[in-house]
Amino acid sequence: MSSAGKLPSEVERTLVRKSGAWTNPAYGCPPEKRPIHEYIEKGVVNIDKPRGPTSHEVAAWVKAILGVHTAGHAGSLDPKVTGLLPTLLGKATLAVPALRLSGKEYICHLKLHRAMPQKLVRQVCEEFTGPIYQMPPIKSAVKRVIRVRTIYHLEVLEIEGTSVLFRVGCEAGTYIRKLCHDIGLALGCGGHMQGLRRTKAGPFTEKTLITLHELKDAYVFWKEDGDESELRRVIRPMESAVSHLPKIILRDSAVDAICSGASLAVPGITGLDSNLAEGELTGLFTLKGELVALAKAKMTTEEILKASAGIAASPIRVLMEAGTYPRGWTKKEEKVQL
């Protein structure tokens, strides 16, 4: 299937098997079955950010509601912007960089400074797909140098007078306000961003959005009634935040070494993404689906499948605690098919 027009997180991925594998049910557990305290500390909430507060304020409220020590959001939204604000909790905050680098999608209200022919508006908007040059706004927190950002798709949804509603999928770090300004310049009439809502952030969509009130209610139900079902619904395992990354599946015997910071050798791999590239950020997972670490691939899929030795990946951030799996465990208890 073609990946044209898709966000990176929407490109279909498949796993290929390198060798047979077994996992011991006595160690680790599927992410969705973690004890509730661990589930929270290794969770992510897809908050529907309201208009008004800053992204940091929303993340602080999430932290206060759940009583976690840390909470970090993946990609800031201006106070007036609404929509998806995935917020990672506790240990899961180590995965924030992986989510921040994923593609984003927005619905934007562009206000033209005078009415223009609809055919021309659509034509000009189409020309803004692909790589574009952007200079960060004057009020930006980053250095003002020209940068290249990719627009994966830009679809005009509605035009009424000087109002243009469009959907845009873009690379992280794209300034939609600047995009609106540049479209106005290209049309020769000028324009500015009137409103903006984020509808996708990496693997997260509006289907799993929750409000701060829903999060608070779910927490109260658990604390007062002992009912954790609603809390498990509104909080997702941290693995969902990196589901867009290529995967490498580890043997049980390789897990603890990775947790201690060791590089991943080829014999420790049982399966992997079919299109892994050297240097690519990848997720290292157990056979039960637990995220062990984020790593940088040192070999391609083809090289790993052919190799019997060598370093396949080097951990960048370790998210699983050492001792979760025994070192060098080899006893065959239960087979898991890829």
Swiss-Prot record:
Pfam families: DKCLD, PUA, TruB_C_2, TruB_N
Enzyme Commission identifier(s): 5.4.99.25
InterPro entries, alphabetized: Dyskerin-like, PsdUridine_synth_cat_dom_sf, PsdUridine_synth_N, PUA, PUA-like_sf, PUA_sf, tRNA_PsdUridine_synth_B_fam, TruB_arch
Keyword terms: Isomerase, tRNA processing
GO biological process: one example: box H/ACA sno(s)RNA 3'-end processing
Superkingdom field: Archaea
GO molecular function, one term: tRNA pseudouridine(55) synthase activity
Location of the PUA domain: 245-320
Presence of keyword Aminoacyl-tRNA synthetase: no
Catalytic activity: uridine(55) in tRNA = pseudouridine(55) in tRNA
PROSITE patterns membership: PUA (PS50890)
Matches recorded under NCBIfam families: CBF5, PRK04270.1
Family: Belongs to the pseudouridine synthase TruB family. Type 2 subfamily.
UniProt name for this protein: Probable tRNA pseudouridine synthase B
Organism: Methanosarcina mazei (strain ATCC BAA-159 / DSM 3647 / Goe1 / Go1 / JCM 11833 / OCM 88) (Methanosarcina frisia)
Lineage: Archaea, Methanobacteriati, Methanobacteriota, Stenosarchaea group, Methanomicrobia
